[in-house]
Amino acid sequence: MNTEEMLEEVFRRAKAYELRGGNCAQCSLSAIFEVLGVEDDNVVRAATGFADGVGLSGDGHCGALSGSTMAISYFFGRKKEDLARLGKQLRALLLAKELHKQFVEEFSTCRCYDIQVKKYGRFFNLYNMEDMKAAVEAGMPEGCSTLVGQTARMALKIILDEQAKKDKKTELPVV
């Protein structure tokens, strides 16, 4: 797949996963991993609690942003053996900051609660069956699944662009 096909595929997969079973963090992360050929269910499992602003609270940032940031960190983050080396995390932090910037430019905020209020006029408590029904009626599955796809696409583009820079630096000069 070329870059554009990969970006479309990650959008399609992330959106489809979100529509099928939800959990914005896991859906964005899973789609990115699949398009890049990564199989790591432990990392996907670790994303579970980030859904809907952490624990369905709405009071944290969007789970799609969390899952996509986890994907960036998976490829560019520092390892446990480097925890004492502050500089080892800089690359992942700068890339995560770029994703956050793009996300806020696109959606005006990164807080799940605020995104829901902006898109649907209110926040939905997804632990409450009446709110769950109201969310479906308001179009939340379609709206959030599109957001999840867009966020996964943003993150994948950042990953691919950063990898291309790294590959260019390691190319041997033509003699």
Predicted feature descriptions by range:
Residues 63, 67-76:
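Catalytic phosphate/nucleotide-handling subdomain of diverse soluble enzymes
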Residues 1-5, 32-49, 122-129:
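Acidic-glycine-rich active-site phosphate/pyrophosphate-binding loop
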Residues 1-20:
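Polybasic, low-complexity association/targeting segments
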Residues 14, 28, 46-51, 151:
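Short alpha-helical scaffolding segments that buttress acidic/His motifs in well-ordered protein cores
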Residues 24, 62, 112:
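Short cysteine clusters
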Residues 50-59:
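Transmembrane alpha-helix interface/packing and boundary motifs in multi-pass membrane proteins
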Residues 30-34, 69-72, 86-163, 167-175:
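Amphipathic alpha-helical interface segments
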